[in-house]
Amino acid sequence: MDNKFLLKSSLLLIMSGTLLTACSDNDDTLGQVLGTLEEEESQFGKANDVFTAAEWYPGGEQGTTTKASYSAVAPCAEQMGLETSFNKGEDFFEHLYTYTDEPRKGLGPAWVRSSCIHCHPSYGHGKRQTEYRANTIGNGYLLVVYHPDEAFTEDGVRYTDFPSNYIAEVTGMPQTKAMEPFKAPIDENQITITWKKVEGSMPSGLPLHFPDGETYELIYPEVNIPVTAFNTNPKPTNYEVRLESTIGIYGTGQLDAISTEDMKAQYAAEANYAQLNPRMWNTTAQDWAEGAYYTLADGTKAIKKFTYAMTRASLQDGAGANAIWNITNVTRSDRRYLYSTTAWAKAMSEDPEVINYIRQNGKDKSSLVHPYYADTDEKIAEKVFTMLDMNTAAKGGDNYTAAFGEAEMSDKDYYDFMVWHRGLAVPAARNLDDTTVQRGKVVFNKIGCASCHRPSWQTKEDNYWVDNSIKAYANANGLDANQILPKFSYQTIWPYTDMVQHRLFMENDIRTGWCRTTPLWGRGLSLRLTGAEDRLHDCRARNEIEAIMWHAYSKQSDAYSSAKKFYELKKEDRDAVVKFLRSI
């Protein structure tokens, strides 16, 4: 973890006339406290002609750290006395899961990664890869394998439109690792990633150089998985593959606190001038479409707000809460079933090598494959299929417990993990007193970037939804489940996202074309903290300039007008926008 203070000389923090204490971290050995300046010399936390005082604190007063870190605890979690749980939860994120070792046991039988931090280097955005290897730290890619519904823009860009459904033969987050003797659903050694370069000019007509002669490059990935790589029965047909990278985890608790009412107002406002995803917004009724609602585990309907595809509605049933189960295949009390497919279970039950291994090694009760053992090959095959096919609550539950034993992650451990997940702070903004940064903000707003990258939101009462596992932990300990996780009530936050999906129509674009506007807060620290600054959903943009210009690839891009205006800027104004983006 990087615990160095953000301020150039550990400037005194002034906010509403009071001294703010920097959030502490649990690894002070990496910290470096620099000398302080006289109070009157410090501009941190002070308003100027362009930035308000609040903008130094993008996560709000309760959700911002003054450390150059994506891993620091938020002030609200400290004030609630949750640091011990936060640090324990952090351990579940940072370290490897294994088959049998407490407390991170239960890996497999197939998995996407053996730890969370594999995909989130230093808690940040994944890094661009030239090959797909699940064990590579920094490989934040998830494989997206789907049946394409082909479409074209007016300027000839091919894209895949809704629904472009995921194939059924492998899990939505495909697994490329498995415990012996099982074979991973996809053999990653057969996956190829080829990076291609846009040549000449973009379909929109814009060349790959600015009017002043400065050049830039645009690259994009082409991913191939041959049918021979699938260890399933049946094997998929008519499919395409895309990559989706992880984004930073910090600040997700603050985003969870944005109210549905405020999101609805944002959708209604944008519907007046932009085409919105009809699965999310009914333009005729000026209201949520049926597809905007997500059914939570207790039957509650809530509006989707998380993931690129807007598939999750609550952080407690969102990407992280889901991933701690399906990335590792580690079960908990409310998910006593596997992340697997029937096609994989069938293929493994029909594989002679799998059956033979279990027959030879499974009789001993201490063997990892003992649960699959029986006295005949036919019965082994039957058990393999039945157990690997326990991929729903109906198939699993008590059946899973009878076959595999109790849930592998305790309710307390999961609670600690969610304290950490919700309690991550956003790093404070930097250099807002710099005149170039100030100029960058003015230009950013003037050319229309803030239309989608909405700068700020005001949270209301943070009445987070509670899942069954945390309810069980609270009930067992006489606690109020609605009061034991970090809350971000009544905070002004500056994530630079409208929480709305848009389309850019890039070459080899995201699966359905629709992608939620990614928050910009803290991204300027990525190179320093993770060693890379790759951007966009598949890391195709290696810097801010490339990310912006991908917005102008097609004239039908929702951001074409703003990106074209950026293209037409003088170099000093382009540089100012970049410096602004690196400062917020």
Regions found by a protein language model. Give the residues of each.
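Bacterial N-terminal signal peptides that target proteins for export
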Residues: 1-10
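Bacterial N-terminal signal peptides
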Residues: 10-18
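C-terminal motif of bacterial Sec signal peptides marking the signal peptidase cleavage site
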Residues: 20-22
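Short, conserved catalytic or interaction motifs in soluble domains
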Residues: 25
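Electron-transfer interface patches adjacent to heme c in soluble/periplasmic c-type cytochromes
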Residues: 28-87, 96-418, 422-435, 446-584
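Conserved short C-terminal alpha-helix that flanks the catalytic cleft of nucleotide-sugar-dependent
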Residues: 93, 443-444
